Amino acid sequence: MESRGKHRLKKNGESKENLGEHEQARIGFHRNGDSADSLSSPVAEPNFSSPGGRSSNSILHCPPQSPEQGNNLDCLVGEELQFLWPRLQCLQHTLSNLPLSEGLKPLMNFETVEDLAALAGKGLLQELKHDYEILCKSLNSAAPLLSPEGNCESLNYSLQPLIAIVYGPTGSGKSQLLRNLLSCHLIDPSPETVFFVVPQIDMIPPQEMSAWNAQLVEGNYTCGPQQTIVPKSGTLKPRLITLTYDDLTADHNYDVTHPQNIFAQAAQRGPICIIVDECMEELGKHKSIAKFFHAFPSKLHDRFPQCTGYSVFVVLHNMNPRKDQAGNIATLKIQSKCHIISPKMQPSQVARFINTYTKAMPTAITLLLKDIFHHNANHINYDWIIYNTSPEHECMQWMYLHPQNGLMPMYLNVQTILYQLLEKIDKVLRQRQRWNTAYSKKCDKLANK
């Protein structure tokens, strides 16, 4: 069972100009640390004061065109290029300074936006205009799903069931991450019952239990009108139930019709969330729990329609454990909708994961993503990078969760479009370079005769 509920989001009808300003503010999301502000200033817009949109002394000389075509190109020079050029420069500068950029083909580009406008040619300008429209359409469609600050308002946007894996070494803040996801309203709908599964109940310190109870209550409320607080679920205080792994895998808990099924009892009240922590050793044994990842959620929802949310979070310390006798971890990876990864994970495991899930992206964008992981592993603590297999929007397929700034889309789809534009510009310039070389050789031969 997989469904998407209605989005309780603010519809934001941003224009292209507003989106351009918003994107301009975010242009330095990932750049060379030695020159963080070198590309942040916008390129000055050329002054086109004549009626045709081009000054009389403009360096842009085009063949005679129909009025409609001429206006389109004038608009392109005045609007689209001013939007695209700083982003193209930023991406090219970033890629050229990547530690792993030795294998990348260097891309040729124009020196300035004026050179691009004057020398690109009609064909390239039309391609730039077409890709600009695709890019703006993508940004406009993502805007209603984001907060005014540009953050994601939910991890799953009512996608059900939510099966997620949290990868992180000891001390990376996995338990704090799970509490923050619940207390910051990033799980939709908010669970009314949370099952905390550990190998042994006595291994949970009292301070952690107090933190869980406090943040569950915090996540159950939101601001209402006239400085009031309103519960987000059908209960005033969500329940926290601790279970051992053996209790989780008890036979009666697989049968939704069994009167002792603890999950069925909770599903009668509302949404539930199951968190499996510190159980990687038990997951690798013979007993299968794969039903909790695919068959069990649909049966539970069919029998208890009031259970509108079913979330499972499984914590792993190793992205590729060797011991998986029952296939639990392999099945979990297949069924998982979200892979929440700490940049502190072993680099070779992170690289293997990225190579597996970015095959449709250009190699340069894959290297950029690896460098983002490497940068955050060395400079920032308690941040996370999330891969979503079923994103609400393509810009949210890869997301970045910062302790202070919240959950942000990484816009790798936009970076892919920009990189493809750089490749088109490079192709045109290299073709002209070959033509000039061939023409020079021909002239030399004629001169020698």
Curated annotation (Swiss-Prot):
Compositionally biased residues, Polar residues: 35-59
Example of a GO MF term: DNA binding
GO process terms (BP): DNA-templated transcription; nuclear capsid assembly; regulation of DNA-templated transcription; viral DNA genome packaging via site-specific sequence recognition; viral release from host cell; viral transcription
Compositionally biased spans, kind Basic and acidic residues: 11-25
Keywords linked to the UniProt accession: Activator, ATP-binding, DNA-binding, Host nucleus, Nucleotide-binding, Phosphoprotein, Transcription, Transcription regulation, Viral genome packaging, Viral release from host cell, Virion
Chain positions covered by the region annotation Disordered: 1-64
Biased composition (Basic residues): 1-10
Subunit structure: Homodimer. Part of a genome packaging complex composed of packaging proteins 1, 2 and 3; this complex specifically binds to the packaging sequence on the left end of viral genomic DNA and performs packaging of the viral genome. Interacts with protein 33K.
Protein name per UniProt: Packaging protein 1
